[in-house]
Curated annotation (Swiss-Prot):
Gene: TAS2R60
Gene3D superfamilies: Rhodopsin 7-helix transmembrane proteins
Additional note from the record: Most taste cells may be activated by a limited number of bitter compounds; individual taste cells can discriminate among bitter stimuli.
Subcellular location: Membrane
Short name of any one Pfam family annotated for the protein: TAS2R
Similarity field: Belongs to the G-protein coupled receptor T2R family.
GO CC annotations on file: membrane; plasma membrane
Transmembrane in keyword set: yes
Naturally occurring in which organism (per UniProt): Homo sapiens (Human)
Protein name: Taste receptor type 2 member 60
C-alpha cells in the first residue's frame, strides 16, 4: 500500500505480474467503494443532524483518509503504468508523493486515535486512570482530529524537503534517474534522511495502536470468559456481542499490522518492486484493506441501519 514502491524506468510485462496488478486494481476499487460509503453515510448524518457519536466521527476521519489514500495510490499506479520512463522526481510524481505522505500519516493517526477511543471506552479495567479517561476522552475528540492533521502536515513537509532536495540535485548536476551518481545521491538521502524519518513517524502511532489493542483484546477476552462461566454458552447475546467485537478488533489489528509491515518492507527494500513476491504481498494487503470496510459496515450499528434503509427503499417498503 506504499505509494513510493514504484520503480520507474521498467515496464511490467510478465503475465503473472499483470494479473496481480489487475487484482490489485480491483481490490483498490472495492476498498475505495467501502471507505467511500462509510464516509458518505456517517458524514451525511453528521451534517444533517449536527450530531454524531465520537467513535463515528473518528470512523469518518479514518474512512475519508483511506478513501483519498487509495485514490491517490490508484492514480499513481495508472500514471506509472502509462509513463514507465517518467523522471522519478518530476512535478506530477512529487505532487502525488506529497499527497500520499500526508494521507498515509493521517490514516495511521486516525487508526491510532480510534484504537485509543475503543480501548478507553470499552476496556473494563478498574484502574482510576481509566475511569478518569472515560469521562475526559470524548471532550478531547477535536484535539485528536486536529492533531492528526497537524502531525500529518508536519511529517509531510519533512518528507517533501528530502524529495525536493533530491530533485534539485538531479537538476543541478544534470543527472538521469539511471545514472550511477544519481543513484548514489538517492540511496544516501534514503538511507540517512528519509528512512530514519519514515521509521520514526510510522513507529510512533503504531506503538500507541499496539498498546491500546493489546489492552483492549485482553480486557474483552477476560470479560468473555466470565460471561461464558455465568451463562449457558456461546448463544447468549452478551457472549455473541463480545465475540463479534473481538473479531472486528482482530481484523482491524491485522489490517494495521499488514499496512505497517508493507511500509517497512517497502522502505527497507526487502521486496523489490519488480519482484513477483512484492505483488503477491501487495495483493494480500489490499485484500485486507478491501475486507475491513465490509466488516465495519456489519459491525457498526449506524452503518447497518443505513444499509437496511437502503435495502428497504429499493424494495419499496416503508
Amino acid at each position: 500500500m506504499n505509494g513510493d514502491h514504484m520503480v520507474l524506468g521498467s515496464s511490467v510485462t510478465d503475465k503473472k505480474a499483470i494479473i496481480l496488478v489487475t487484482i490489485l486494481l480491483l481490490l483498490r476499487l472495492v476498498a475505495i467503494a467501502g471507505n467511500g460509503f462509510i464516509t458518505a453515510a456517517l458524514g451525511v448524518e453528521w451534517v444533517l443532524r449536527r450530531m454524531l457519536l465520537p467513535c463515528d466521527k473518528l470512523l469518518v476521519s479514518l474512512g475519508a483518509s483511506r478513501f483519498c489514500l487509495q485514490s491517490v495510490v490508484m492514480g499513481k499506479t495508472i500514471y506509472v503504468f502509462l509513463h514507465p520512463m517518467a523522471f522519478p522526481y518530476n512535478p506530477v510524481l512529487q505532487f502525488l508523493a506529497f499527497q500520499w505522505d500526508f494521507l498515509n500519516a493521517a490514516t495511521l493517526w486516525s487508526s491510532t486515535w480510534l484504537s485509543v477511543f475503543y480501548c478507553v471506552k470499552i476496556a473494563t479495567f478498574t484502574h482510576p486512570v481509566f475511569f478518569w479517561l472515560k469521562h475526559k476522552l470524548s471532550g478531547w475528540l477535536p484535539w485528536m482530529l486536529f492533531s492528526s492533521v497537524g502531525l500529518s502536515s508536519f511529517t509531510t513537509i519533512l518528507f517533501f524537503i528530502g524529495n525536493h532536495r533530491m530533485y534539485q540535485n538531479y537538476l543541478r548536476n544534470h543527472l538521469q534517474p539511471w545514472n550511477v551518481t544519481g543513484d548514489s545521491i538517492r540511496s544516501y538521502c534514503e538511507k540517512f534522511y528519509l528512512f530514519p524519518l519514515k521509521m520514526i513517524t510510522w513507529t510512533m502511532p503504531t506503538a500507541v495502536f499496539f498498546i491500546c489493542m493489546i489492552l483492549l483484546i485482553t480486557s474483552l477476552g477476560r470479560h468473555r470468559k466470565k460471561a461464558l462461566l455465568t451463562t449457558s454458552g456461546f448463544r447468549e447475546p452478551s457472549v455473541q456481542a463480545h465475540i463479534k467485537a473481538l473479531l472486528a478488533l482482530l481484523s482491524f489489528a491485522m489490517l494495521f499490522i499488514s499496512y505497517f509491515l508493507s511500509l517497512v518492507f517497502s522502505a527497507a527494500g526487502i521486496f523489490p518492486p519488480l519482484d513477483f513476491k512484492f505483488w503477491v504481498w501487495e495483493s494480500v494487503i489490499y485484500l485486507c484493506a478491501a475486507v475491513h470496510p465490509i466488516i465495519l459496515l456489519f459491525s457498526n450499528c449506524r452503518l447497518r441501519a443505513v444499509l437496511k434503509s437502503r435495502r428497504s427503499s429499493r424494495c419499496g417498503t416503508p
